[in-house]
Amino acid sequence: MNRLPIRFEQVEGGIILLAASALYFILGNNPWLFFLLFFTPDLSFAGYLVNPRVGAVAYNLVHTLSLPLILIALGLTSQSLLFLGSFGLIWVAHIGLDRMVGYGLKYPDGFTHTTMGWIGKDKGKN
């Protein structure tokens, strides 16, 4: 299996993580809030308690850039909505970390089957 596209995605994830984090802190946002909310998107794992399909949909919904970019755009529209942009940056940074370490979007057959290959106990299936 040619892993070069996956490596590119991992490097891109690292750049996204660094850029979103840097922008968050350059804008003078609260560091404690960043660390407190950084793993909030992983609450979507709770969907796996229902079944793998629901888990994959929940995980994928909060691990794509669409929703956090909407929050960032809303945060740019008004001073009173600035906190939404800050949360969006934290969310984007989290997604970047996941991609950097090889966690892609999930397939409905199980948590370990991702768009970037198999992870965890199933990693050898690549």
Predicted regions mapped to residue ranges:
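N-terminal membrane-targeting hydrophobic helices
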Residues: 1-126
